[in-house]
From Swiss-Prot:
InterPro entries: ApaG-like, ApaG_domain, ApaG_sf, Uncharacterised_ApaG
Protein name per the record: Protein ApaG
HAMAP family linked: ApaG
This protein's encoding gene: apaG
Coiled coil residues, start to end: none
Superkingdom of this protein's organism: Bacteria
Species for this entry: Proteus mirabilis (strain HI4320)
Domain ApaG: 1-125
Annotated Gene3D superfamilies: ApaG domain
Length: 125
């Protein structure tokens, strides 16, 4: 778990074998992120930014409004959880990024998401 500006981020990733096709260099991963608002006031997630790196060092940047079609308002002490996915051309890679947030007083701030691994289970024994 990573905490920044009284916000804790927890990440879990999983390889989706049923949607992957290694012979076509297509490896599908799902990741679930839990955002825990430790502040005494509500916060809203406005934007996301991801840097996705495959095992060959090739990178893809993804950015946009909110997450999974939402700009969630996360009340004080509450958690928001969502699941999304990434497709890589290699069986292992990483993701890192940040969220742009706004607090109840209208102050913008950024929550960094440190690097986490995407890998098929047989590679991380």
């Amino acid at each position: 778990m990573f905490t920044s500006s009284k916000v804790a981020i927890q990440v879990q990733s999983v390889y989706i074998e049923s949607q992957s096709s290694p012979e076509e260099q297509r490896y599908v991963f799902a990741y679930t992120i839990t955002i825990h608002n430790l502040n005494k006031h509500a916060i809203r997630l406005l934007r996301r930014y991801w840097l996705i790196t495959n095992a060959q060092g090739n990178t893809t940047e993804v950015q946009g409004e909110g997450v999974v079609g939402e700009q969630p308002l996360i009340e004080a002490g509450s958690r928001y959880r969502y699941t999304s996915g990434a497709v890589l051309e290699t069986p292992m890679g990483t993701m890192e990024g940040h969220y742009e947030m706004i607090d109840a007083q209208g102050r913008l701030f950024q929550i960094d998401i440190p690097v986490f691994r995407l890998a098929i289970p047989t590679l991380i024994n």
